[in-house]
Every structure is written in C-alpha cells, then in structure tokens.
C-alpha cells in the first residue's frame, strides 16, 4: 500500500515568497522544555476531550493533596462527668476538662496500678522512665500527667508507697468512667474494655496525638527514654521554644 504524502502537507504563506506553495509543516523550537506525560496524553485529542481530560487531572491532583493532609483531632473534649486528679502532693482536685497550659504533654496510661510499690523492681516502667528525665521534660516546657482507670483510693495508696528515689510531682487522673481512655482509643480490648492500655502518649499544645509508645514487658528502657526525648524535643523546636 502506497501512502499519499500530500495528506501530510499544509498550505503555508511565507512572507518572502511571491507565490504560495505547498510545503511540509515543520516546527522547530529553540527553547528546550521538559516533556510531561500529560502533554503526551493530551496531544492529538479533540478540544472537548482535552478539556475534560485536564479537568480530570486537576481533580485528581486536588484529591491527592487532600489525601496527603493529616487531620489531627483534639484528644480531650468536654467531659460529661467530672474526673478526679491526684496531684503531686496527694491532694484531690475535680476537673471537667483537662487544661492544656504547656507546649506539650506526656501522658502515661496505666492499667491496674494496685500493688506493692515499695521496691523499685515492682514499680511500673512508666514511672521509672519518666522519673529519670522528668527535669529534662520540664526544660522543654513539657508536663507529665498519668491517666488510669483505677479509683482515687488506689491511686493515693500506690503513690504513697513509691520509693523515695522515684517520688516526683506526677498528677494522676482517675478515669474510672473510661471517658478519656475511650476518647483516645486507649482501652484494652480484652476484659470488656474496662482497663487502660499501658502506653506513653505525647500530645502537643492543642491536644493532638503526636506519638504513641506502648509499654510491654520486653520494652527496652533506654529505647523508650530516647523515643520520648526525641519527640518532646521536636515539639519544643516546632513551637519555637528550642533552637
């Protein structure tokens, strides 16, 4: 089959020529530009189809950008029932909403905290870790709060029997109605979801969860300390409080 070359020729009027003649259309650009997939896919399309294709590409780009945006929900809401906080000196206060006064918070969630804590070996890993670098957290303008589903009486009992080396001002919230733990998804799935998971949760100044560090029997203390320090330091830099 012989191809008619005249089908690929277009009439072009030149400024210098006196007579118009048929010549092959050739476009030579002196500007180099990067070829894109979108240009290759839209080349040769009908204008209506090309417009629809571009609109679809723009819509897909917007969807991708929206998917990349991370939406953080506040951790604490107005509580339907007041909760009680055992402060660092053993006093009991009633609150309806956890105030966010510092740049960030380190929340220590406890399961069942009842037990004999007269010896350091029996103390939960949360308290051992936090007590070692509590001054460092304060230097980053970070406060520490414990949250447990235990009663106020049990909290006062185990705090009173802490070893002297681990005694520091750690306020502990008695979330006996499980409202805070349920809101943050920190209830243990076993046992009817009545006990809090053992974990350290770091939130920023507006109540957004930035890191969750679960506590297990095999958790390395040094690794846990490093993880908490790095996250808190990042929040301090983010808030402009540390260079």
From Swiss-Prot:
Subcellular location: Nucleus
InterPro entries hit by this protein: AhpC/TSA, Thioredoxin-like_sf
GO cellular component: cytosol; nucleus
Keywords in alphabetical order: Meiosis, Nucleus, Ubl conjugation pathway
Pfam families reported for this sequence: AhpC-TSA (PF00578)
Residue ranges, annotated region (Disordered): 28-50
GO BP annotations listed: cellular detoxification of hydrogen peroxide; hydrogen peroxide catabolic process; meiotic cell cycle
Gene3D superfamilies: Glutaredoxin (3.40.30.10)
GO MF, one annotated term: thioredoxin peroxidase activity
Disulfide bonds, paired cysteine numbers: none
Subunit structure of this chain's protein: Homodimer. Interacts with but2 and uba3.
Function: Acts as a negative regulator of the NEDD8 pathway. Has a role in meiosis.
Protein name: Uba3-binding protein but1
Organism: Schizosaccharomyces pombe (strain 972 / ATCC 24843) (Fission yeast)
């Amino acid at each position: 089959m012989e191809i008619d070359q005249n089908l690929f020729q277009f009439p072009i009027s030149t400024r210098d020529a006196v007579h118009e003649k048929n010549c092959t259309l050739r476009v030579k650009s002196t500007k180099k530009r990067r070829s894109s997939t979108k240009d290759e896919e839209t080349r040769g399309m009908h204008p209506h189809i090309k417009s629809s294709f571009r609109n679809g590409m723009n819509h897909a780009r917007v969807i991708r950008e929206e998917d990349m945006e991370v939406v953080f929900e506040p951790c604490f809401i107005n509580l339907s029932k007041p909760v009680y906080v055992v402060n660092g000196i053993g006093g009991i206060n009633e609150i309806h909403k956890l105030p966010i006064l510092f740049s960030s918070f380190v929340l220590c969630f406890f399961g069942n905290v009842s037990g004999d804590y007269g010896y350091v070996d029996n103390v939960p890993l949360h308290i051992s870790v936090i007590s070692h670098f509590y001054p460092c957290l304060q230097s980053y303008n970070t406060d520490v709060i414990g949250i447990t589903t235990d009663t106020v009486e049990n909290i006062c009992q185990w705090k009173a029997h802490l070893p002297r080396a681990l005694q520091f001002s750690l306020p502990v919230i008695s979330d006996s109605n499980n409202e805070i733990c349920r809101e943050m998804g920190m209830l243990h799935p076993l046992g009817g979801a009545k006990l809090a998971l053992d974990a350290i949760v770091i939130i920023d100044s507006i109540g957004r969860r930035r890191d969750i560090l679960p506590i297990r029997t095999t958790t390395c203390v040094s690794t846990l300390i490093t993880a908490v320090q790095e996250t808190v330091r990042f929040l301090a830099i983010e808030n402009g409080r540390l260079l």
